[in-house]
């Protein structure tokens, strides 16, 4: 599946509560990006993603996959948390290298399952060699995501992976 696992649809739509009309716009953006689904990862707000998922499932017959999540701070790092089926939680460090003072290596522990390798908002601040080395050392999944703050940016970067593979990594 083509999945963009780091998006901010509330900011992208300027709506803090999703409606059927707003979700229709999100679905159109996901499809325009050639994706099968997205992770909705608002800053400190997991409820938005769950509400979008509920509307997609109820009103749009599950037309796209929606993985609810949130982006939180862990020290100076930004951690993206995805809430997968069967209460499985997958966590990855978003845009390592931003903020610049973040100590990536010290933020990697057993709760982290992946590292974002590509992110169009922060590629200039990310050290690909270091990210790849740390991913290999810690057996972490490398991900590419848009970090979209506008609907038109959804799918600019994405990861090809099955949800089952994310679940297996997180167990």
PLM features per residue range, with description:
Residues 26-45:
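Divalent metal-dependent hydrolysis catalytic cores, especially in the metallo-beta-lactamase
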Residues 66-72:
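Hydrophobic/aromatic-rich structural module bridging two neighboring secondary-structure elements via a short loop
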Residues 1-5, 9-19, 24, 28, ...:
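Charged catalytic cores and adjacent phosphate/nucleic-acid-binding surfaces used
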Residues 87-95:
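N-terminal-biased segments
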Residues 5, 41, 70, 94, ...:
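Active-site flanking residues adjacent to catalytic metal/cofactor-binding acidic residues
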């Amino acid at each position: 599946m083509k999945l963009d696992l780091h998006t901010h649809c509330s900011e992208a739509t300027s709506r803090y509560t999703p409606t059927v009309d707003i979700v229709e716009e999100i679905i159109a953006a996901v499809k325009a990006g050639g994706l099968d689904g997205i992770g909705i990862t608002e800053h400190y707000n997991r409820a938005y993603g769950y509400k979008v998922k509920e509307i997609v499932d109820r009103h749009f017959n599950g037309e796209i996959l929606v993985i609810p999540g949130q982006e939180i701070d862990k020290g100076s790092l930004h951690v993206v948390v995805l809430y997968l089926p069967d209460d499985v939680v997958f966590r990855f460090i978003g845009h390592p290298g931003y903020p610049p003072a973040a100590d990536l290596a010290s933020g990697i522990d057993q709760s982290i399952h992946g590292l974002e390798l590509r992110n169009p908002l922060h590629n200039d601040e990310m050290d690909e060699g270091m990210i790849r080395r740390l991913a290999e050392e810690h057996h972490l999944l490398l991900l590419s995501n848009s970090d979209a703050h506008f609907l038109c940016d959804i799918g600019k970067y994405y990861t090809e992976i099955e949800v089952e593979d994310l679940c297996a990594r997180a167990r």
